[in-house]
């Protein structure tokens, strides 16, 4: 932990407690309990973040969603990396826009500021028996309790995350995400998930659905990551229904990830 000023403590779970073991949420609890500031800034230990802004004004937020961007360390990203960057751009744009409209459906513990006392009050809502998902379950808990959720879409506070370099690691992460889905109860999250799943299953049955879906999702991608090519986005759109189906089946078969 590191104090960056009198109101915020940075909390970074290290490798070894940030893996798939069930100790992760307990470790977060210990770190956040030990903090003495009003807020904690949660981030992953492998993100790249260089704050370029002035003193951060939290304006009474209980949860502040901060921007993330995926970027490869390679000068010429692989196909897998390019697909992940496009997907992540769409996810991030949806995260930002839904939060701005007061109906947040996603957030990421890779770059998140939370009021310490509120996090501790919500700890039992984080499903400690499930290794991952503390960020999404926290979002659900805060929405259910009517707490103040805000978003700051400012590149000065943007953290950089890296794409997976192997298909195996990529699908393991997506299966973990899918495996948590049955635990979600928030109506906005469920509605969004149902629309995404339904549209992609419909595309498997009728490929012409792509003509409706692609312009919507391409807008999300380009707004967040303008350098993603049309062909990368189109390939992602074609493969996405198969990828979602595989992730869901794998995630449900391996519950408890």
Task: Name what the model sees in each region.
Residues 1, 6-12:
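Hydrophobic targeting segments
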Residues 36-37, 106-123:
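Conserved nucleotide-sugar donor-binding
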């Amino acid at each position: 932990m590191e104090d960056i000023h009198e109101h915020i403590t940075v909390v970074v779970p290290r490798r070894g407690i940030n893996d798939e073991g069930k100790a992760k949420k307990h470790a977060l609890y210990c770190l956040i309990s030990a903090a003495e500031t009003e807020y904690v800034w949660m981030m992953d230990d492998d993100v790249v973040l260089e704050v370029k802004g002035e003193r951060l004004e939290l304006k009474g937020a209980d949860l502040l969603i901060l921007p993330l961007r995926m970027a490869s360390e390679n000068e010429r990203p692989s196909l897998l990396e390019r697909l992940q960057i496009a997907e992540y751009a769409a996810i991030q744009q949806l995260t930002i826009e839904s939060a701005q409209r007061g109906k947040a459906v996603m957030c990421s513990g890779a770059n998140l500021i939370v009021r310490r006392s509120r996090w501790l009050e919500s700890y039992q809502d984080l499903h400690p028996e499930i290794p991952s998902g503390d960020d999404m379950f926290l979002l659900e808990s805060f929405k259910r309790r009517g707490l103040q959720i805000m978003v700051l879409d400012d590149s000065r506070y943007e953290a950089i995350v890296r794409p997976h370099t192997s298909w195996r690691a990529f699908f393991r992460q997506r299966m973990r995400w899918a495996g948590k889905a049955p635990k979600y109860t928030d109506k906005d999250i469920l509605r969004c998930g149902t629309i995404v799943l339904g549209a992609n299953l419909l595309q498997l049955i009728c490929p012409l659905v792509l003509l409706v879906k692609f312009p919507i999702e391409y807008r999300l991608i380009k707004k967040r990551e303008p350098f993603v090519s049309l062909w990368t986005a189109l390939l992602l759109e074609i493969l996405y229904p198969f990828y979602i189906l595989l992730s869901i089946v794998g995630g449900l078969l391996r519950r408890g990830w």
